[in-house]
């Protein structure tokens, strides 16, 4: 099992290219099940989750063709991938596959819309609270589907003639359930109106791609999305938007370690709340023509309180990274997590580096310390793992992070991107 070794104390200076967003790429890939034509996606990141989903989609009958690297691709590793699903060969998504990756549960929407029935395993996946699937079931039931749970699987069936448009308001915001309902509704008869929809940029990205395929979706990015059903969708070409979580993560790494870095192929507008928070913490951030520049002068890190919220609030996927930054602030800060209940698994690991953090319910109180000291730590989930890397960049001496397979699910070439900016980060394969 690989580990990552970090020797702290170096500033970061240089350019970091930002990859395509994992959280956009996954639903976009699943959308290929909605058409018998080819969906071509550009800027697809090279991540463990993406590779796994390609295999899962292959099981349903999707042919996947990856363009080879082009000359002059230099620093960008982004890939163009063609997905073609002429016929769906299997409408069952097995436990073996869905348990490895939550997002693969989302195939339930397209399979139901295109084939009229499917059998999908209830998910296992990343250890963040319960993450119920009720919202998905209720949303699809509103479109006329019958859903029964049998031996850990959902047997879903559309009415004769296909799904029927309806009005449905989610009791709480769910990005995954918004994706699924939107995909299913594209082929439903009549109009669907989704209330309390997720407003995340990744939802907008999926809507833009579905519209390019011939869907009629308006209102994406607001709390109400309207979908006029069409009889079929065609192929399209779509570029995956930049990864705002990766952007925020590297911005926090620079704020932690100090230095001056340009993040390329990204957009400040995708994470305004997080950028504003970083500015309050003492980082200088400015837009560039294709990204943003982040600098931190030597004045230290100021304490800032945050509460995670659905978009446009502070993203839960940056909470751990921000907490790592706050461990070195000049005072006391509070981090309140409202999205996922056990998302503080990184706290005890940060404590091993010398952080002072106490928990009370959903809130963590962080007392900034003068210095962190390197130690062996263990990653518990994707975002927690990168928070340990950020802390390690500023810790004295050597930090080793084990279980880095979590990192590989969501960060492309992390050690390479940081090393190029002067950090000492290396992967140790055992």
UniProtKB/Swiss-Prot annotation:
The modification 2-(S-cysteinyl)pyruvic acid O-phosphothioketal is found at residue 126. CDD domains: UdpNAET (cd01555). The active site is at 126 (proton donor). Keywords: Cell cycle, Cell division, Cell shape, Cell wall biogenesis/degradation, Cytoplasm, Peptidoglycan synthesis, Pyruvate, Transferase. It catalyses: phosphoenolpyruvate + UDP-N-acetyl-alpha-D-glucosamine = UDP-N-acetyl-3-O-(1-carboxyvinyl)-alpha-D-glucosamine + phosphate. Pfam families: EPSP_synthase. This is UDP-N-acetylglucosamine 1-carboxyvinyltransferase. It comes from Rhizobium johnstonii (strain DSM 114642 / LMG 32736 / 3841). The lineage of its organism: Bacteria, Pseudomonadati, Pseudomonadota, Alphaproteobacteria, Hyphomicrobiales.
